[in-house]
C-alpha cells in the first residue's frame, strides 16, 4: 500500500576518514611508535659488562674503548658516557699507610692527595665523589665510586658532558651499585 506521508530515508555519502588521510595518519602513528620504542630502548636498555675482575650493569650500547690511563683496567664508552675502571691493590696503598678495610672516603682522600688531577670536586659522601672537569672547550660531569674486593679497591669513574648531568647522575649511581667483584 502506498503511504504518501512516509518519506524514504536519505542515504548520505560514506562516513569516515578518507583513505589518503588514513594512510598518512597510519604512517605518522607507525613513525611515532618506532621512535618511541627506540627512545625507550636507548634510555633504559642495559647489559652486564664483563670487566677485569668485576661485572656491572651499563647502557646496552656501551663498548670497550682505549685509554691513555696506564692504570686503567678497562674503559667503556658510547656517544654520551664513559666508564673507567682502575684497581689499587692493597700492596699499592700499603706504601702510604692504607690497607684492607679502609672506608671509601679515606680511599678517595688518598687518591685526591696523591694523584695529579685537574678535577674540581663538587661533592663527596660516604659512597661517591662528584666532580667537574674541562677538557678544551668541553665541560664534563663525573662521579667516582669505590668497591673493595679481590685484593684491593676498584675505582669506577663515570663521565658525561655537563649538559647531560641530569640525565645520567642517577644512572651513574645505579651502575655503581650494580658492581660485583669476582
Segments predicted by a language model, with ranges:
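N-terminal targeting sequences that direct proteins away from the cytosol to non-cytosolic compartments
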Residues: 1-78, 148-152, 159-182
Amino acid at each position: 500500500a502506498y503511504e504518501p506521508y512516509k518519506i524514504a530515508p536519505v542515504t548520505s555519502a560514506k562516513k569516515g576518514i578518507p583513505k589518503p588521510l588514513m594512510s598518512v595518519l597510519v604512517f605518522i602513528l607507525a613513525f611515532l611508535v618506532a621512535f618511541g620504542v627506540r627512545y625507550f630502548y636507548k634510555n633504559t636498555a642495559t647489559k652486564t659488562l664483563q670487566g677485569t675482575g668485576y661485572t656491572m650493569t651499563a647502557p646496552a650500547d656501551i663498548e670497550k674503548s682505549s685509554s691513555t690511563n696506564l692504570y686503567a683496567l678497562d674503559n667503556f664508552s658510547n656517544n654520551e658516557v664513559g666508564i673507567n675502571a682502575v684497581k689499587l691493590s692493597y700492596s699499592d696503598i700499603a706504601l702510604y699507610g692504607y690497607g684492607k678495610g679502609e672506608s671509601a672516603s679515606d680511599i678517595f682522600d688518598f687518591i685526591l692527595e696523591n694523584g695529579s688531577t685537574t678535577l674540581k670536586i663538587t661533592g663527596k659522601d660516604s659512597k661517591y665523589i662528584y666532580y667537574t672537569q674541562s677538557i678544551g672547550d668541553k665541560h664534563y660531569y663525573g662521579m667516582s665510586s669505590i668497591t673493595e674486593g679481590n685484593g684491593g679497591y676498584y675505582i669506577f669513574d663515570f663521565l658525561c658532558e655537563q649538559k647531560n648531568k641530569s640525565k645520567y647522575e642517577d644512572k651513574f649511581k645505579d651502575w655503581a651499585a650494580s658492581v660485583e667483584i669476582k
